[in-house]
A protein has these predicted regions:
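A generic N-terminal leader/anchor concept
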Residues: 1-60
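C-terminal helix-coil-helix/basic helical segment that borders enzyme active sites and/or dimer interfaces
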Residues: 22-30, 271, 289-323, 327-340
Length: 383
């Protein structure tokens, strides 16, 4: 299979990873046989260190560069890009955490791909939007543990609850970020929960229609002990507002790569098909360039911390672009796209179907924007 323009970025900077992904993209989507290899492959190509300061073990650069890496991988394999999103987003949580000891403890293993990082914060994002309550509760046991043998003087808790969906729960070892409500009251916290902590149970992989090589499962905690050393933040709502642009920016990277690849694939059709869609492809290509620039500069300049609505609108526009580009690819691919093993058309249709549902989902964002607009109308502050 020849390399398309959208694939040249990764092929140039990480040729071994690019060929591995091209050889296994279908397998990564349809079964779990290679699920343990994805994080080490991404690490060998150096992608986990992109946008991480050199003094912390990274290769420097910006969050914009990390968004580009996710997009580059998505042009080859959306499943691998989703794993990269989970891992790199967890790394970002540590970079933005005030808990330096936690960062020092976990970062080296995450950057070299020995440990997988999973982000279970959909529940927290939905909580922020008043859609659902937090699903994990913490009981403060500080007094109990500090009076027991060997007890320390730092806060400690026991947590109970679960998360129905988390990606990158690599069976060889993971740490998962989860938001936790405190029985004692106060703002919820976000903790890093280790795979081998007592009471942690990872389900079997969920029986997905695609993205099956992503180690996606449910996670249950029963009386799991956690300490201050495990806490990413003690004020989840305030911290999430600051981290959300990077979280969403990296997630949007997956859409950028998918759109690029689908638009490139329209060139693989015959001359008549190409000319029929040429104007549409040109319009979508322009939109892609403009959305890419706005996304990366907005995240880099920190604009979306105070104006999340503009980021939500970008996410919605990108999801619509994914849909339009994937549809054009189907049209130009003809019957070949409907035959197994001849192209990535069917796989990209499944991948595109995931984009609107990943949190924050399109319906969630549309409702939030509508509520905000209603509020502005009431207060006469429509812009
Ligand atoms: C393959 C896969 C991997 C995933 N990986 C992760 C992961 O790594 N980490 C993680 O945290 N999550 C993950 N998720 C969860 C995902 O991000 C979404 O949260 C989940 O798919 C949507 O939740 P639900 O199906 O329970 O939606 P439901 O709660 O059933 O809601 C259906 C839809 O309506 C929206 N909705 C519900 N109530 C409201 C409301 N009041 N106002 C507006 N909109 C509303 C929801 O956002 C959703 O789009 C994954 C999901 C899948 C399919």
């Amino acid at each position: 299979m020849s390399t398309t323009a959208s694939q040249q970025g990764l092929t140039a900077r990480a040729p071994a990873l690019a060929s591995w992904l091209d050889a296994h993209a279908e397998t990564l989507d349809t079964d779990a046989t290679l699920s343990g290899e994805v994080v080490p492959q991404l690490a060998s190509a150096g992608l986990l260190r992109v946008g991480v300061p050199v003094e912390l073990g990274g290769t420097g650069g910006t969050i914009g560069d990390a968004i580009d890496s996710v997009a580059d991988v998505a042009a080859h394999s959306f499943a691998a890009a989703f794993v990269l999103w989970g891992q790199r987003t967890f790394i970002e949580y540590l970079l933005q955490s005030p808990n330096q000891a936690l960062r020092d403890r976990l970062l080296p293993a995450l950057l070299c791909g020995e440990l997988a990082g999973a982000t279970g914060l959909s529940n927290a994002m939905k909580y922020l939007s008043a859609i659902e309550p937090l699903q994990i509760r913490a009981t403060d046991v500080t007094t109990l543990s500090s009076s027991g043998v060997g007890g320390g003087d730092t806060s400690s808790w026991r947590v109970n609850g679960g998360l129905p969906w988390i990606t990158n729960l690599r069976k060889q070892g993971f740490v998962a970020a989860a938001a936790v409500d405190h029985e004692a009251g106060g703002p919820p916290s976000i903790f890093a929960i280790a795979h081998d902590a007592p009471g942690v149970h990872r389900s079997d992989d969920l029986d997905l229609i695609g993205l099956r090589g992503t180690n996606t499962a449910a996670l249950q905690m029963t009386d799991t002990p956690l300490r201050e050393d495990d806490r990413i933040t003690d004020n989840a709502p305030a911290w999430l507002v600051r981290v959300r642009p990077a979280f969403l920016g990296l997630q949007c990277g997956m859409s950028l790569g998918l759109v690029r690849r689908s638009l490139d694939a329209t060139n693989e059709g015959g001359p008549a098909a190409r000319s029929a869609v040429a104007d549409d492809v040109a319009a979508l290509t322009d939109q892609l360039a403009s959305l890419t620039t706005r996304l990366k500069s907005g995240v880099l300049r920190g604009e979306f911390v105070d104006t999340p609505a503009s980021l939500f609108k970008l996410r919605i526009s990108l999801a619509e672009l994914v849909h339009d580009a994937a549809t054009l690819e189907v049209q130009t691919g003809g019957g070949r796209g409907y035959l197994r093993g001849l192209s990535g058309v069917a796989r990209r249709q499944r991948e595109a179907a995931f984009v609107p549902i990943v949190t924050p989902s399109l319906v969630q964002l549309k409702n939030q924007l509508a509520a905000q607009r209603e509020q502005q109308l009431k207060t006469g502050t429509v812009t």
